[in-house]
Amino acid sequence: MSVPWFNQFYKEIADSPLSAWLELLPGQISTWQKEQLHGDFNKWVKLLGKLPQTHPSEIELKERVEFGLQSEINEYTQKQIIGLLKQFMPWRKGPFHIHGIHIDTEWRSDWKWERVQPHIQSLENRYVLDVGCGSGYHMWRMLGENAKMVVGADPSQLFLMQFQATKHFNPDPRIHLLPVGVEQLPEKNAFDTVFSMGVLYHRKSPLDFLQQLKNQLRPGGELILETLVVEGDENTVLMAGDRYAQMRNVWFLPSTDALCLWMKRLGFKNVRVVDLAKTTIEEQRATQWMDSQSLVDFLDPNDHSKTIEGYPAPLRAVVVAER
């Protein structure tokens, strides 16, 4: 089943710094649509098509992500929207407010944004890339800072569907999600700002990943990196065994000093740690929109300073640097 989302993106970038992407990206997306679709993809697209057309009178992106008022839809339509959106569970990153419907996601991603946003350069009129964007919560907040265009990259097709479900209620032409990894993006030094939050520790080759992020930035552009870290000096890096906090796909957890050293070795400038925060069970928890296990189940029940495997509990750093 072909979808129109990407053709709209190609039109938007034709006269932009991203125009060189048109040499490769349409072919990659076409191959993806032919060969790599999730088994539920067509079902999900049909569900998206059932979302009712509404006319939100108010769009709020600066303080939260909210599309429309409860008073603009009737009770039947509200139940219809809830029923359809719940077909895309689990909802991990948010929260979203759609015509009075509170999508209470596993993560309070708004808390992370509050830790990040004060420390970054203005996004006004900037081309912004969010690598590992999930369902796009932070992309909407970036748009709320008046970015010229926000592009997200995340290979998860469920996240793509969640993004398209929210975009249904605010079809803004300045925001797009591509179902690809950063390694598939053409390296054209086109972005003013690149974000990558919650991805580095999932990569087997973290320095290669940092280099890929750098290759998306224009000279002088800003990188905002948020990742799990451990305490220690510049020689401290934790590699967990089979799992870390029940996650299988976790590789390197450096200290902040080690991470800054990696970035300096790769040629990043003005590298600095701007925030350090322990993840709490209030920030990541099970909800009606993500009703399976969450952080409290992944920590030592007798000592929340440790994971269930005995490693240091999640500690997240925000590092900012320029190309």
Swiss-Prot record:
Catalytic reaction list: carboxy-S-adenosyl-L-methionine + 5-hydroxyuridine(34) in tRNA = 5-carboxymethoxyuridine(34) in tRNA + S-adenosyl-L-homocysteine + H(+)
Broad enzyme group: transferase
UniProt GO molecular function: methyltransferase activity; transferase activity, transferring alkyl or aryl (other than methyl) groups
Gene3D superfamilies: Vaccinia Virus protein VP39
Record keywords: Transferase, tRNA processing
BP GO terms, sorted: tRNA wobble uridine modification
Binding-site positions, carboxy-S-adenosyl-L-methionine: 93, 107, 112, 132, 154-156, 182-183, 197, 201, 316
SUPFAM superfamilies cross-referenced by the UniProt entry: S-adenosyl-L-methionine-dependent methyltransferases
Key word tRNA processing present: yes
EC numbers: 2.5.1.-
Subunit structure comment from the entry: Homotetramer.
UniProt cross-references to HAMAP family, sorted A to Z: tRNA_carboxymethyltr_CmoB (MF_01590)
Family from the record: Belongs to the class I-like SAM-binding methyltransferase superfamily. CmoB family.
Protein role: Catalyzes carboxymethyl transfer from carboxy-S-adenosyl-L-methionine (Cx-SAM) to 5-hydroxyuridine (ho5U) to form 5-carboxymethoxyuridine (cmo5U) at position 34 in tRNAs.
Name under which the protein is recorded: tRNA U34 carboxymethyltransferase
